[in-house]
Amino acid sequence: NSGILSRQYKSLIVPICVNIMLAVSLNLVTGFLGELSLGHAGFMSIGAYTSALISINTSFLPPALSFFIAVVCGCILAAVFGFLIGVSVLRLRGDYLAIVTLAFGEIIKSVINYLNFTGGSKGLSKIPLYSDYNNFTVVFIIMVICIVLISNLINSRDGRAIKSIRDNDIAAESIGIKISKYKVSAFVIAAGFAGLAGSLYAHNVGIIKPNIFDYNKSIEILVFVVLGGMGNIPGSIISAIILTVLPEFLRGADNLRMLLYAIVLILMMIFNNSKFKANLSLNKTFRKLGKED
């Protein structure tokens, strides 16, 4: 039994890493840039299908090389679509941007659903497994690199420019910050990492279908970000881990599972909100002290 449980929870490591990458990358756009995007699952699906098709059709290459090419291509193509979306929605904000990105995700899903070479509604199967529960080291390393890169970006000069656009885009533009450049860059980076996460996901499960990447998946990723805290990378990581593992822990609870799940979500929201208020009060205190000085 202990062996079975060990295997069961080991199998969650790759999904946890994938969800962390999705949450952290979406936080770049939604939390730090301040733009509500509901099409993250669309970028994930582009990466997943691109890498899966390349892996299936390059089986004659060494497995490691085939996997590397597939993952890189999935990441790049998703980033290209991120650029196209970023340029297209430069003048949109708030609800309008959310609607357009949501429509993008659904259009991608519908296109994949009707193409023959993607397997249509049946999806793709027999995808080579390069990142199963016994071989999660590569996925974990990629996840760490993703977190480090985005964290360094946020703490850099470019990251401060992105946050200034969120706070006040008019003021940011007035001091010479190129808003269009940073908005598009944020979309490209977030989409690229989402495509990378999708590639790793495809090579972990071995079977992908269009309905996996519907708007529910985009909402799920957004929940990771909101519950963890907008503009809070450690919070996104913790939220992604808890919400990925929690359903497995509650699997044996039967009727109480949804109730317990809801209680945990509420507690996370309360904790996050109280932490936000505490930070806000500290900021006000420091501002008052600064004025007195």
Where do the model's predicted regions map?
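Transmembrane alpha-helices and adjacent helix-loop boundaries
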Residues: 1-293
